Amino acid sequence: QAVNAVLYGKYTMEGDQFEKIEVDFGRSTKNNITQGSGKEWSKQDRDTFDPTHDLDLYCDQASGLVNIAIMDGTVWRLLNGFKLFREKLDTRRGSNSQLETAVKDLGAVVSFKGYYGDLAIVVAKTSYIAEDGIEKRYLPEGTLVLGNTAADGIRCYGAIQDAQALSEGVVASSRYPKHWLTVGDPAREFTMTQSAPLMVLPDPDEFVVVQVK
């Protein structure tokens, strides 16, 4: 949910007991960009092209300040291939505790490359196992995500439709624990915790997602 909300401003929610539904946060179309003909980074001169103008233009589409760029390896290789980008990339700046905390346990799949002005450059290779059993990357190939490290989602909870919870006066709760006994030989005691979280992105325009070609 969270990754798709950032990438597309929406996601599909589905389960065994309800129909598939699309949760759309209403991201502006200008915040999902695909590099057009003649603008592709792969077709630019590596010695003379400066990607600064493009990056500034992309960042301007966000509703707030952008201070981090997260990309896959394909985008990083393109960017780092530009001479003018390498000359401006600061790899010696001092510590940033907030950023270090965010990536400290992800050293094998997340790499902090440095700062491009005030923009932290991070390469992510995180993956997950899809329903078909195939490992897939969270970031599709050629994806650049621009955002702010302070951006945060909200975990919302729907109503737990349990008559016992209602009879106990549970009106609003993130989780509802319950236990019950069954009569028999042997008798059994069961425990269960019910929860219905839904990830919400309050401002989907905080992020700008670029498909780099």
PLM region descriptions:
Residues T34-R46, R86-K213:
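Sequence/fold signature of self-assembling virion shell proteins
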